[in-house]
Amino acid sequence: MVRLSTKPPNPKVEMNLKEPPITGAGAGAAASPPAPSTLRRNPPRSARPPPTPLPNSKPSQISRLLEEAAERLKVFLRIRPLPLPERKGKAKSPTNPKQVCLVANSPNSVALTVPHSKLLDPKRGRTEVFDGFSSVFSPDSSQHDVFSQVMNPLVDDLLLGGKSGLLVAMGPTGSGKTHTVFGSPRNPGLVPLTLRRIFSPTTHEPFSKLRSFCFSMFEILSEGKGERILDLLSDATDLVLQQSTIKGLKEVSVENFADAEALLFSGMLKRTTAATNANSKSSRSQCIITIRAVHKSSDAESENSLNNAVLTIADLAGAERERRTGNQGTRLLESNFINNTSMVFGLCLRSLLEHQKNKKKPLEKHFKNSMLTRYLRDYLEGRKKMTLILNVKPGDDDYLDTSFLLRQASPYMKIKYTNLEDSSGLVSQKRSSASLICQENTKKRKIHKVAGKDDIDKDDGVTISEKDESQYKLLNSELRRVSRNEEIMTNFARALWTVLKQYKQKLLESENAVESTRELLRSKDIKIMELEKKLKVLSCSCKKFPAVEDTFVEQNNDVSSGQVAQSFVSLSSQTDLVSIDSALNKSLAVEEVSEESTGHGPERSSDYDDKTGTGGSDVCDTSIIKLIAEEELCSGDCKPEKASSSDAFIPEHDVEKENIGIVVQVLDKKLDRSESCSDGGGVTHSSSSLDHPSDQSFTDTCLQNESANLSPQFIGASKKSPIEQSEEEREEIHNITTEGIQQNVHTRGVKHHSTPSCSQEVNSGSLHVSSSQLQGMGALQQDPQSERCKPTVEITIVEYGCAQPPHVVDDHGGMYPCTLNGKSSPRKAPISPTKDNQAEKLTDKIEDLSASKPCNRKNTRRRLQPVSAMMLKEFTGPDIFVDTRKEEKVKSSRDAMGRSDKLIRLLTDHPPRARGRAQ
């Protein structure tokens, strides 16, 4: 290097240099010029010549062999292309540091750039360069490019050299390891391409027809906190790892590529995979594929060279970060297993590197911590050749995983393999140039070794045979025990099955018995119901009153209190009249029933009658009648006599009429001859017929009193109307109720001086009274012990359809209102005095009127009759002769009113005489 000065030059020096030198006489006269001045420069330096090698110096053969044998571990790096969603919306240049953190600088090196999100100071960028890779595959590289550089050397060693080889795919989860190893049907990976290369015969493979290949495939996965081996080509689960071999592993001999490919894809379907947040199809196990070459000939040399040649391909599960995957439970245990296996594998390689650097440092036995490293022990200890292919992702989000893998794998490139398996050939070459003595010594040593090996083999065979025999005995005893237990369990199962069948049969029988019992109970219940019905019918017939459904009474909407009394009198008329006390008790009971049925008193019935002008009243429950009838039957001293079997029915209902009339007819027109009390105490027989215009009446006054006591309508009539009414008032009442039908029914009593007499009013609406009943009644009338029959004759007048109360004529001929149960109205003065001859004349007039023919009446529309009308119609005596059916068809309502008024006037002016005097 020449360094130049920076000072300006001297002008005098320059002039001296420019002026030419003076010669001749002028030169002598002038002074001699000074010596010229020159610049000082550094002298040139010559380099030392390189040392020349000695003419006879050559590298030794041993060092050359060791240098060739010292083959390094090959490490390949493949960068996965970015996924399609990440490519959209980004720059076209893939080297953009903001989006891609890993870039290939050369075929053997890559540059890793820290993303801006990870930098503490964004202004200062940081880039790391990792070199020394055997090859770096860019994202655009194909599967065939990877196969040609990675797998071709291993396949050549297997086919041509008979050497074993191992390919391990490592990398984080989702980096493309499985795709690189297996590929897809359209883009096959390294394993399918290897099988295709093996089973495609070529000219440079002279041993292709003399050997076969065995294919096996298994995986190592986690089981709880442990590990287990699963065969992917069979369903066997009992696989045991013994040193570097797997006991029970199925090896399938394949002859062509199609069979091998079918086995490969069937094993892929059984592989354990799962979805995580980082990868949708994440491998959860370490998958290992082995291809073993087997020689077919009997040549010992070729067999020895090919027996142990195995090509192994391992697809390791990717390391996972818990924060990115979000695994929990079983997936978290699987992540721990995967990360632990990757860590142990890296520790084994680092221990091998340190041991090669320092021979004094022993080799750590990290391979014992994992089942995968135990199986690959020969490769991890440097005795067999191994190749690594690292798969990484270039995205900014994957910077941590990529940097960790590159830092971990960068030292592995310095690992060397001495390849001790192939050193025997080199040793044989050295022996050929050795002395004969050494050769003889070597032969002797070999002979001694072979003899020792034979002895050892014999001893081992003896010990193995002894062990096999003891094991055989043990297994035989175990087999007998298991067979005995199986027989016992079979017999027990049969016995249990028989017992279950018996219990099932018994259960069916019991169910059938229960069903039959239920049917029997149902049939008995039906019989009981039928018997109860029959019992009710018989009880009704025994009590001498018809059932509720046998009584037919037509009424508009409700039943009057008169009907209640009618039913009660009908029932009570069938019993024997023992005494007047019983009659009084009966009248009181009937009065209570009538008050309850008519709205708690006669006032309600009177109001209702005044409003409607008809005989309707509240509905009375027939059950009350039944209860009263039962009490009468039970309280009587004598049993009731059997009544004649005659039914009461209701006449036809006239549709044209607005109101309904109640007419009770007796089917039997002729009654049996009955007995009645006469003047001399004898019995008189009389025949009664409804069609006849005049009927004979009972002359017993006691019977009339009892009939009056038994009819509650008399009480209502006496309470509803005043004691006396004038003729003008009666005419006004008749004019108001012109449309209704009114009748006056006069009950006449005959006075007996000699013996006490009783009277009974026979109701035409009730059942017929037989002759036996009448005879019993006559006997009671003649009984001298009956002290309650009064000797006087009382004539009770009952008005039907009129508001005037009934009157009674005393002994002196005076009239006073009728009383019930000893109760009379406050006004007791006689209305008009009468005499016996007047009574005689009145009786004759009544007989003439009853004997005369009734006038024809027009068919008129009838309304409901008042309570008093219905009561008097029901309690009409036998000596009142009224033909109801003919009167309805012949007479009009106004004519009937006129005739009834005349009869009332005759009765009031001329009281009737005793029938006995007339006779």
UniProtKB/Swiss-Prot annotation:
Keyword list, A-Z: ATP-binding, Microtubule, Motor protein, Nucleotide-binding
Location of region: Disordered: 1-59, 591-615, 674-700, 711-730, 737-764, 886-919
Biased composition (Basic and acidic residues): 597-612, 886-912
Domain Kinesin motor: 72-415
Biased composition (Polar residues): 755-764
Residue numbers binding ATP: G171, P172, T173, G174, S175, G176, K177, T178
InterPro entries the UniProt entry points to: Kinesin-like_fam, Kinesin_motor_dom, Kinesin_motor_dom_sf, P-loop_NTPase
Pfam families the record matches: Kinesin (PF00225)
GO molecular function: ATP binding; ATP hydrolysis activity; microtubule binding; microtubule motor activity
Superkingdom in the source lineage: Eukaryota
Compositionally biased spans, kind Low complexity: 28-45, 685-697
GO cellular component: cytoplasm; kinesin complex; microtubule; nucleus
UniProt biased composition (Pro residues): 46-56
Keyword match Nucleotide-binding: yes
Matching SMART domains: KISc (SM00129)
One of the GO BP terms on file: microtubule-based movement
Entry similarity comment: Belongs to the TRAFAC class myosin-kinesin ATPase superfamily. Kinesin family. KIN-6 subfamily.
Protein name from the UniProt record: Kinesin-like protein KIN-6
Lineage of producing organism: Eukaryota, Viridiplantae, Streptophyta, Embryophyta, Tracheophyta
